[in-house]
């Protein structure tokens, strides 16, 4: 998971792109907002991974083997499995952070071309487990990349409410102007994660990948966040890489990964019946 530790999310791609040797460069939120108006449109039907296989550089072993997934727009999808099973690598394929060894990403029945990658990434948000925050105030971290005079403060508050951190921030003497310290040192792990989630909501991207992004939240806060996500309109598509069963119970489809392959998929109740390994995960209530 080294690449995950280095990756700070779609708004913070510079380090990750240099590691995985993509030619595209990071753009600020302001540039992305302008760019989105003219080019690749938000998908209306499906995001499809077709026969995706992937081998990391200098490795003889395939990290992914013939992955086929169709994600209907507006659904909540979960990837589960042990560390190294392929779930994060699959999410990286959806985000075009890794070039597949074979196979293709299809958006609304149209294969995504190399020239479309930046456009596609501008439509997505990635919320990692390990959050990188600016040594600045809360409003700058939520509206990442925007000049202060371009920030919509009302929209920042709306995003903070959706991320279940409104009460805390509103109780602070300086509220949105509170400095979070170096990499968010003045915040708890759960608070940092919620700031990152608020950032994704502020960008108003409709495809959001959450890579163990609720791991530091207590059960009640996580439950409230999942409820808030469920109440969003059907234009939002969520992909959860989860560490707790409670995160994925309400998902429309759960994909179980094992050794770079999908070993089972279906709704929660369906997997309870047909997957022994999923039942074992449920009994432990944690995904190792």
Question: Can you annotate each of these PLM segments?
Answer:
Residues 20-75, 111-113, 151, 158, ...:
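Primarily ABC-family ATPase nucleotide-binding module
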Residues 22, 104-106, 114, 139-182, ...:
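ABC ATPase nucleotide-binding domain helical subdomain, centered on the C-loop/LSGGQ "ABC signature"
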Residues 80-82:
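The feature captures the beta-strand-to-loop junction immediately N-terminal to the Walker
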Residues 89, 122-125, 130, 141, ...:
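ABC-family ATPase nucleotide-binding domain "signature/switch" substructure
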Residues 95-96:
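Helix-to-loop junction immediately C-terminal to a conserved catalytic motif
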Residues 101-111, 253, 262:
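ABC nucleotide-binding domain "signature motif"
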């Amino acid at each position: 998971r080294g690449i995950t530790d280095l990756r700070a999310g779609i708004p913070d791609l510079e380090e990750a792109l240099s590691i995985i040797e993509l030619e595209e460069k990071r753009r600020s939120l302001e540039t992305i907002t302008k760019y989105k108006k003219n080019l690749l449109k938000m998908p209306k039907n499906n995001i499809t991974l077709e026969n995706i296989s992937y081998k990391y550089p200098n490795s003889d072993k395939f990290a992914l083997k013939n992955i086929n997934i169709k994600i209907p727009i507006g659904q909540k999808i979960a990837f589960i499995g042990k560390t190294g099973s392929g779930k994060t690598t699959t999410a990286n394929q959806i985000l075009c952070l890794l070039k597949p060894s074979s196979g293709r990403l299809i958006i609304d029945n149209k294969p995504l071309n190399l020239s479309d990658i930046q456009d596609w990434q501008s439509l997505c948000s990635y919320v990692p487990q390990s959050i990188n925050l600016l040594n600045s105030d809360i409003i700058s971290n939520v509206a990442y990349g925007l000049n202060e005079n371009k920030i919509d403060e009302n929209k920042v508050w709306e995003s903070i409410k959706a991320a279940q951190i409104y009460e805390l921030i509103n109780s602070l003497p300086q509220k949105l102007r509170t400095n979070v310290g170096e990499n968010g040192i003045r915040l708890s792990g759960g608070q940092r994660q919620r700031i990152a989630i608020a950032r994704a909501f502020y960008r108003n991207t409709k495809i959001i990948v959450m890579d163990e992004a609720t791991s530091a939240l207590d059960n009640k806060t996580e439950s409230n966040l999942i409820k808030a996500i469920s109440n969003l309109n059907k234009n939002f598509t969520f992909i959860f890489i989860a560490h707790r069963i409670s995160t994925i119970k309400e998902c429309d489809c759960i994909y179980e990964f094992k050794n770079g392959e999908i070993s089972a998929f279906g709704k929660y109740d369906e997997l309870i019946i047909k997957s022994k390994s999923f039942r074992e995960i449920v009994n432990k209530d944690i995904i190792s």
